[in-house]
A protein has these predicted regions:
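Hinge/capping helix and adjacent helix->loop/strand transition within the periplasmic-binding protein
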Residues: 26-29, 55-57, 79-89, 101-187, ...
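Amphipathic terminal alpha-helices
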Residues: 308-321
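N-terminal (or domain-start) structured segment
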Residues: 24-111, 150, 158, 173-206, ...
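Sec/Tat signal peptide C-region and signal peptidase I cleavage site
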Residues: 18-24
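Short coil/turn segments
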Residues: 41, 95, 129-134, 156-160, ...
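C-terminal lobe and pocket-closing loops
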Residues: 207-279, 324-334
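Bacterial N-terminal signal peptides that target proteins for export
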Residues: 1-10
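Mature extracytoplasmic/periplasmic domains
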Residues: 277, 281-305
Length: 334
């Protein structure tokens, strides 16, 4: 084969490889729906609305938030999963839930069935109604030990962030508590403020305004790092009293089911790198609410969320709540 022909062929192939993009830019022609599977006003609803506004600007298309609470988030998530795979229906929430719905027998899906676009990492705070006598995490834990199953704790339901956090405390201390569930973090927090329950273990972002207004007394961040809450001050971590306590970060974000056109995912990944990662609005949200700004996508997002998936799944298994063994779903014990 003549050398000149070979050089021409190679040059042509190289040009073709460079000229053809991996995926075309997605330009939506109608509004996008994000199903928030929790009640309005909760942590998922709050941060999703901030994120949706940034996506609207980047895409030049309306993003509609639809709240569909119920069954610990599985109803709205199922509706997003079963929607047409045209890229116009997403969901949002805590990424750990996607990895544990199947463990709990609530929904046949795994974390790998979704493209993850994270915005913040949240931690829970153990707080009480100010009318209760508890002034520290130790006092509340001691009371739970003295009165097993009597002290009520409000959460957004089984498998919610607040429930997972409280189960981690129960596992570490051996306490039993009365679990009272609500359709979302905000209703759970309001219930504790109203005196329907004595305590809540919901996310700090959901409690922030009530803590600032002295309508809730925060006892400890359910983690190993303190939280500096604007307008209040420092909330000490639970590890101050329980040094060996562990609770992985709980990442929140927007989730797109696999099977949508690849250009949808590629466009969102570009938006996350160029817009969301630089979002002043999201950074301010995180700072004011005691959250961590965490704009991860792709493989980085999957890697970040897996420790929480493991912890949540095996907590369910160890407490007898799991319907399916986590290791059969590709979730090894941490």
């Amino acid at each position: 084969m003549p050398a000149k022909f070979v050089r021409t062929l190679v040059a042509t192939l190289l040009f073709a490889a460079i000229a053809v993009p991996a995926h075309a830019q997605w330009k939506p022609t109608k509004p996008i729906t994000i199903i928030v599977p929790w009640a309005a006003g909760g942590s998922t609803d709050q941060v999703t609305r901030v994120t949706a506004a940034e996506i609207e600007k980047a895409l030049g298309q309306k993003v509609i938030i639809v709240n569909q609470p119920g069954a610990s988030g599985s109803i709205g998530t199922k509706n997003a999963l079963e929607a047409p795979k045209d890229g116009y229906t997403w969901t949002a929430g805590a990424a750990q839930d996607l990895g544990t719905y199947a463990v709990l027998g609530m929904l046949d899906t795994k974390i790998g069935d979704w493209a993850l676009f994270l915005n913040v990492a949240n931690v829970s705070t153990l707080s009480v109604n100010p009318a209760t006598p508890y002034k520290s995490a130790t006092e509340l834990v001691d009371a739970m030990k003295a009165k097993p199953g009597a002290i009520s704790v409000a959460t957004a339901g089984v498998n919610s962030s607040g429930h997972s956090a409280m189960e981690a405390i129960a596992k570490a201390t051996g306490v039993k508590y009365k679990h009272v569930t609500y359709d979302g973090g905000n209703p759970a927090v309001v219930a504790t403020v109203a005196g329907e329950t004595e305590a809540t273990s919901q996310l700090t972002v959901e409690q922030a305004e009530m803590i600032r207004g002295k309508k809730l007394r925060p006892l400890a961040v359910i983690g190993d790092k303190p939280v500096e809450l604007d307008g209040f001050g420092m909330i000490e971590p639970l590890t101050k009293w329980l040094p060996t306590f562990k609770a992985p970060a709980n990442y929140f974000g927007i989730f797109v089911p696999k099977g949508v056109p690849p250009e949808v995912i590629a466009t969102l990944e570009k938006i996350w790198a160029n817009e969301i990662a630089k979002s002043t609005a999201l950074k301010q949200y995180a700072t004011s609410r005691g959250a961590q700004f965490a704009p991860y996508a792709g493989a980085d997002a999957q890697k970040a969320v897996f420790p929480a998936v493991q912890a949540n799944a095996w907590s369910a298994a160890d407490t007898g709540k799991a319907k399916v063994a986590p290791d059969t779903l590709g979730i090894p014990r941490p």
